[in-house]
């Protein structure tokens, strides 16, 4: 695992180094024309980061699968936002799904008007019940008053995930926290204890391992160089380290009890998305968008 962690951090450094290239997903009426020069630079880097993550994470999953059995992209547009969905499937990484939203105007009172807004969310569903399930998100927004914010969440739904693997993912995040001189405690506490406070119906809230971190629910981070590097690095470290463990565990035997835990986990995630999460249950993104990107490949009732 130590060699894998060094490999992950080396790949992370590469990702950080290349994210200054020209923006991806940039189109007319993209919102960047309403930003000053510094804001445009961060917006462009965030757009490029999205492309970098797609290439890295879908590529890593495809390598584990020995090639995806399918890889589909879809775009959905309405008056509030454009949604870009990509879903790939295979024998080991059963489903990896991504949703990017480009927001034009609020659809709910829990949103603020923006001049630029991007949400990048990615879920990984492993075939093996020993791997749990990853839900991750990172967002950059500039508001009409000229301020900006970074946020995100890094969730591991436990299922039958193994302690050794969860420790590996947790350590990968701790490397980034330490590098940037930040205390992980308040961010980790939100996934360990208090995130249910934001749930529409707390009894359906996702059951998370005390491994990841949440950067929502605080005064969100302002957009500056240090915060941008921290957020993009920790996001990449989380998903990539999970895929490392998935590759190492792909041929491990499992029991009927493990399968039952996976089935319960997937049902819990479905309930969370329909009844607990304010964004999905509140209709901010259409069901056919977030359902395609984030829901498990199979849920049993």
PLM ranges: what are they?
Residues 21-26:
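Boundary at the C-terminal end of the N-terminal hydrophobic targeting segment
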Residues 27-111, 225-229, 243-251, 258-287:
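Gly/Pro-rich turn-and-neighbor structural signature
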Residues 1-4:
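N-terminal secretory signal peptides that target proteins for export/translocation
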């Amino acid at each position: 695992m130590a060699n894998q962690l060094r490999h992950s951090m080396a790949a992370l450094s590469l990702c950080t180094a290349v994210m200054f290239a020209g923006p991806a997903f940039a189109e007319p009426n993209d919102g960047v024309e309403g930003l000053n020069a510094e804001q445009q630079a961060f917006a462009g880097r965030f757009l490029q980061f999205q492309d970098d993550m797609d290439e890295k994470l879908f590529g890593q999953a495809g390598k584990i699968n020995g090639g995806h059995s399918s890889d589909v992209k879809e775009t959905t547009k309405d008056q509030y936002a454009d949604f870009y969905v990509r879903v790939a499937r295979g024998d080991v990484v059963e489903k990896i799904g991504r949703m990017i939203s480009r927001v034009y105007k609020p659809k709910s009172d829990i949103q603020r008007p923006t001049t630029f807004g991007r949400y990048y969310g990615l879920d990984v569903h492993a075939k093996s019940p020993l791997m749990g399930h990853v839900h991750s998100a990172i967002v950059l927004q500039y508001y009409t008053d000229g301020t900006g914010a970074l946020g995100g969440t890094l969730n591991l739904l436990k299922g039958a995930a193994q302690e050794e693997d969860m420790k590996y993912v947790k350590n990968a995040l701790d490397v980034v926290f330490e590098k940037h001189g930040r205390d992980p405690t308040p961010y980790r506490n939100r996934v360990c204890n208090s995130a249910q406070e934001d749930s529409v119906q707390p009894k359906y809230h996702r059951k998370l391992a005390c491994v990841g971190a949440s950067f929502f629910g605080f005064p969100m981070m302002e957009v500056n160089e240090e915060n941008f590097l921290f957020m993009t690095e920790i996001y990449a470290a989380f998903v990539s380290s999970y895929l490392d463990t998935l590759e190492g565990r792909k041929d491990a035997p499992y029991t009927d009890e493990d399968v039952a835990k996976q089935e319960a986990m997937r049902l819990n995630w479905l309930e969370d998305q329909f009844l607990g999460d304010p964004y999905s249950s509140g209709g901010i993104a259409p069901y056919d968008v977030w359902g395609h990107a984030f829901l498990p490949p199979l849920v049993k009732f």
